[in-house]
């Protein structure tokens, strides 16, 4: 299915864009706006019910912070974070989600 394959490729493209855009000084909010705009430019919708794209990795899930509007914390201020865009084409039967964990080492983004 061409549409299905295209969705999987867009997920890869989104994770590549994370490497192109994110620095340890990028805020969770800046990443939220950049990646949501990138998703739209690719012709897709963000399906997450809260609109976020991932979160910090912490022992207590109640202490998570999210890649969302209003979060001014810098990516480099957390030990690990997920990037997990949940996307779809408008009016499609398919949705896509790829989740990876990332961290910074000397300002270089690393995929766990």
Residue ranges of each PLM-predicted region?
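Active-site neighborhoods and metal-handling regions in enzymes and metal-associated proteins
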Residues: 1-112
């Amino acid at each position: 299915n061409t549409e299905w394959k295209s969705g999987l490729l867009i997920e890869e493209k989104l994770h590549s864009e994370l490497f192109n855009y994110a620095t340890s000084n990028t805020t969770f909010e800046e990443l939220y706006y950049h990646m949501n705009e990138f998703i739209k430019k690719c012709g897709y919708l963000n399906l997450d019910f809260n609109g976020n794209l991932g979160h910090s990795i912490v022992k207590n899930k109640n202490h998570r912070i999210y890649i969302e509007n209003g979060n001014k914390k810098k990516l480099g201020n957390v030990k690990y974070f997920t990037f997990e865009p949940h996307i779809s084409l408008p009016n499609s039967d398919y949705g896509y989600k790829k989740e990876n964990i990332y961290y910074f080492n000397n300002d270089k983004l690393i995929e766990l």
